[in-house]
Amino acid sequence: MDPRSEKIFKAADYIKERLDGRVPVAGIVLGSGLGKFAEKIENPIVIHYKDIPGFPVSTAIGHKGNYIAGELGGKFVIAMQGRIHYYEGYPMDLVTLPIRAMKVLGISYLFVSNAAGGINFDYKVGDLMIIKDHINLLPNPLIGPNLDEFGPRFPDMTHPYDKKLIAKAKEIAAEAGIPLREGVYIAGTGPSYETPAEWHFFRTIGADAVGMSTVPEVIVARHSEIPVFGMSVITNAAQKEFAADYKNDGDDVVKAADAAADKMTYIFTKIIESL
């Protein structure tokens, strides 16, 4: 067996032992500032990344580094309270190991969330954006020998985000009076924030929001034909002109995401309830 697969199955076996034979219907990835989403999970089973054999550990601001398994929307789910980023120095097989492990656990759906910078001038801080498509500027996690037990060598990416889940989210948000955006997310390596020229370039090629994560997770999920729903919290607004004292700040990103967390939690919970 490929050493990467061995690591995935070893991690999954450790997690399985703590789930008492229960199979999660969905995996959820909680981005910067969205960790309190996990507080909504009932009868939680907490599994620390640092205790899982061969597992990477989150070092980013606002990422605690736990799996939380339990009940959400009447369904058994497993959530990542903190993700792994490429900019932390991990290779892509470790960045995506948590998603692969959840695949082995038996998830049928993947929900991903992130804090993202607004590129579209219409977007405001605190807006929720459904991710309808993405642009990847990170290394592709499928580079290297294919893991045949997870999917084909050349997976199709025509529909990276599930249209039925998107339609359900819009229906739920409309009923609750929660305004939603829908746009294209572009993922860069980070950890430096974007220059004004890069923001202009990203807007020119069709991106609406920018971040440093999510896309590798979506690629490996789709490699295994797992339906994906993605949502961004816009944590800073696009600037037509950058003031002399303008500055991106990680703490501000976390605060803005935290302020929108309840709305995102409601939408995710209601979708999961409907599965």
Spans of model-derived segments:
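Generic non-transmembrane alpha-helical segments
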Residues: 14, 18, 164, 168-179, ...
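Metal-dependent peptidase/peptidase-like ectodomains
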Residues: 147-186
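His/Asp/Glu-rich mid-to-C-terminal helical/loop segments that flank catalytic regions of hydrolases
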Residues: 239-275
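Active-site/ligand-binding-proximal alpha/beta "capping" segment
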Residues: 172-208, 275
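Short acidic/polar active-site loop segments enriched in Thr and Asp
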Residues: 108-109, 208, 227
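Non-catalytic positions within long, well-ordered alpha-helices that form the structural scaffold/packing
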Residues: 103-104, 203, 222
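Metabolite-binding pocket within alpha/beta catalytic cores that recognizes anionic/polar moieties
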Residues: 1-157
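Zn-dependent metallopeptidase/amidohydrolase metal-coordination segment
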Residues: 212-251
